[in-house]
């Protein structure tokens, strides 16, 4: 015999999982700060003033590639990457630099199919606690 109260936690879990799946990603309303295109490939950078989302598309399904990012005099990132099954690649970036109020970030993504790059400016945002 099934106890009615045993179903309550299971039902609650289903409702929470459904609500979480329906929620928009936290970055869905971030404005675009930079964009580049090469044929079917696109590179888009969106941000909220502190965090930035770097997204490339059209690289080719599961394609090998390179991701390059530089920010002032920091040692640049130069990574081997693999695109997702849909040909996309996404990373988040926090452009904080000690003793710097801002700067310019260069981002480049390439695969055998294309090469896209763009730059965007960042500025340190003061945190105001109310």
Question: How would you name each of these model-derived features?
Answer:
Residues 8-16:
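Bacterial N-terminal signal peptides
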Residues 1-9:
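Bacterial N-terminal signal peptides that target proteins for export
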